[in-house]
Amino acid sequence: MQPSSIVVAGLGVLVLLARPAAGSQASQPTAPQASPQSAAAVPDFPGFTVKLTFSDKASNTLLARKETVIVAAYLWGYPKPGTPKHLIDDIGQVDLGEVKSEVAPDKDADFGDFQLKKDPLQQVDSRGPQLLINVFSGRKSSPNNLLDCGIYEGLLKSAREANIKVACKLIGE
């Protein structure tokens, strides 16, 4: 195995098979693929949906500007005692990766079932993988984010039942 493969495996890259909502576009996982030896899959995690709501002004602006919305799902975990330092990020978490779904402002973001890589997941403590959802504009009509949105944070295993809703308005609204 090449040294770069070891580093990639240690980063806790997430292998996701995200299925976007009908009429939406999903970006591929943002991290590089690890070698087959370190990419051993663990049990599936069920997919989940993020329901987006917008203020009238935000909705009208996004539609008029033909702007998209990006829903970013960041996965992480609390490290077990003795977790190798190379698996712990600068804020003390095990990075399990991220996936993004780009949707029209009138669509929900659907994330399909996926698997996490075995190596980093084995270093997560008994609380299990955590999920953080952030939402921002797709920057099609402006180089800057246009949206001020809430977040969602919770257990990954509970995401399907959590009925995740994120409300957005325009920045400064």
Tell me the role of every PLM-derived stretch.
Residues L62-I70, S126-G128:
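Short coil-to-beta strand junction motifs in C2/discoidin
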Residues F136-L147:
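Short acidic/polar inter-strand loop motif in beta-rich domains
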Residues A26-F48:
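Beta-strand-rich domain onsets/edges
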Residues M1-A9:
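Bacterial N-terminal signal peptides that target proteins for export
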Residues Y78-D125:
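Tryptophan-paired
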Residues K51-L62:
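Short amphipathic, basic-aromatic surface patches that mediate peripheral association
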Residues G150-E173:
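Extracellular beta-sheet/turn segments enriched in Thr/Pro/Gly and aliphatic residues
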Residues I70-Y74, L132-N134:
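Beta-strand signatures of extracellular beta-sandwich domains
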